[in-house]
Regions:
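Anion (oxyanion) recognition and catalysis
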Residues: 151, 272, 363
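Active-site cleft segment of glycoside hydrolase catalytic domains centered on the general acid/base Glu
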Residues: 173-308, 314-336, 350-360, 380-385
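Substrate-binding cleft of secreted/luminal carbohydrate-active enzymes
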Residues: 341, 347-399
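Structural recognition of the beta-strand scaffold that forms the well-ordered cores
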Residues: 97-102, 117-123, 157-161, 235-239, ...
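N-terminal substrate-binding region of glycoside hydrolase catalytic domains
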Residues: 82-234, 238, 244, 248-250
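Extracellular mucin-like PTS domains
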Residues: 33, 37-79
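Sequence contexts marking disulfide-bonded cysteines in secreted/extracellular proteins
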Residues: 18, 172-176, 398-400
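Secretory targeting signatures
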Residues: 1-36
Length: 400
């Protein structure tokens, strides 16, 4: 009997009646595209046990959303919860209040040299019809190139969304701008620049909302369907530019202020549903002339502020130079109970005389970020790498 007990235990183990304890298994990252990050970019770690369908995509940036199989569960065979790391814009960039308009991604490398940390591509690559040329198929190759170039220069992007696709603009007439428009689309070397020619509000708002949610998801840095290698997310989106501008050679939007409010509402809700911490910037007010301010008075008196995180004013050499139009614009929106952060996303100077005083005046009046139109004050020529006005270098120290 003394020799029988060990044999009995061995037999039970062999037939599976008793199983040794299983060591705990550590959590693993399950999204193959999740990039390496450093501690300055980690904000939160979220865990989930639900499966996440992943759109089919490849390194070329082309994604066919219709090929997603929602019945396939990438994590269904794994009982451990995946860890998703949320990328954020580092504090060193967030605290910098200097940005520049750039027309080409090669200009991004000039921004840190000049003392800035932000870029507003203009008109930029974030146009619905240029990304989704065919309904349901997205080509992110151009936007990917911008994002990669920006993070290589350690520059954060303010992306301007152009909610226009020619194939969608079928429900209204007279949507196409004049061919003399400064941003009429032109194709060169296989690349189309400018802005889609038809510029009414989307006809199929559901399709537009799907586009913008897909775009935001690719660059939000949450580890789900992100651009492979993403390190610096896009957290700020401007919906259109100067929607009140209506000129033969410069029209950004064919619609009323109420049309813009509805468009902004749809954009805001689609972005927030995908990226709750993303911020929506109002399309820039073109100045403080009566026709521009009246557009925004109606917009804000009709409840537009609930779909805006950041208000936006421009100074293009006209108006109040001392505050870059911030003082008057702030007073105007305050009249309707609106108290939002204010950015100046276009500041243009003809000379160097007042750049420091007016920049400080804009901050004192309530601006929290200023984007300059050119690297060399008074010049609008394409910039040369390393060339900029020295006056810019001292401005970053004045950020509040």
């Amino acid at each position: 009997m003394k020799n029988f007990l060990p044999l009995l235990i061995i037999g039970l183990l062999f037939f599976g009646c008793i199983s040794p304890s299983t060591p705990s298994i550590p959590l693993h990252l399950t999204n193959a595209s999740l990039p390496a990050t450093n501690s300055s970019q980690i904000q939160t770690i979220n865990t989930t046990t639900t499966s996440i369908p992943v759109n089919s995509s490849n390194s070329s940036g082309i994604s066919n959303v219709s090929s997603t199989n929602n019945n396939t569960s990438p994590t269904s065979q794994n009982t451990s919860a995946p860890v998703l790391i949320q990328l954020i814009i580092p504090a060193s960039i967030e605290s910098n209040c200097i940005g520049f308009l750039v027309g080409d991604s090669t200009e991004l490398q000039n921004i840190p040299i000049a003392g800035g940390a932000w870029a507003r591509p203009h008109p930029g690559p974030f146009a619905w019809g240029f990304i989704e040329k065919t309904p349901g198929i997205y080509d992110f190759s151009e936007t990917d190139a911008w994002v990669i170039s920006a993070q290589q220069s350690n520059v954060a992007l303010l992306a301007t969304i152009w909610p226009f696709a020619d194939w969608d603009q079928t429900c209204k007439q007279n949507c196409e701008v004049d061919s003399s428009d400064q941003f009429y689309p032109k194709t060169k070397g296989g690349f189309t620049g400018g802005i889609p020619a038809k510029r009414c509000a989307p006809c199929n708002m559901t399709a537009y909302e799907h586009f913008i949610a897909t775009l935001v998801e690719r660059y939000d840095g949450d580890g789900v369907n992100d651009l492979p290698g993403l390190k610096l997310p896009i957290n700020y989106y401007e919906i259109l530019n100067e929607p009140a501008m209506d000129d033969k050679t410069l029209t950004f939007f064919k619609g009323t202020n109420m049309d813009y409010l509805e468009l902004l509402k749809s954009s805001y809700e689609a972005i927030k549903s995908t990226c709750a911490n993303c911020k929506i910037v109002q399309g820039g007010a073109a100045g403080i002339d009566f026709k521009f301010l009246s557009f925004w008075e109606t917009f804000y008196s009709s409840g537009g502020s609930q779909y805006v995180d950041i208000a936006n004013i421009h100074y293009i050499g006209n108006g109040d130079r001392d505050t870059l139009n911030v003082k008057k614009f702030k007073q105007t929106i305050n009249n309707y109970g609106v108290n939002k952060p204010i950015w100046v996303t276009e500041a243009q100077y003809s000379s160097k005389d007042s750049i420091t005083s007016s920049f400080e005046g804009s901050l004192d009046a309530g601006a929290s970020r200023v984007f300059f139109v050119s690297f060399k004050i008074g010049e609008m020529n394409p910039p040369v790498f390393g060339e900029y006005s020295l006056e810019y270098q001292s401005l970053a120290a004045k950020c509040k």
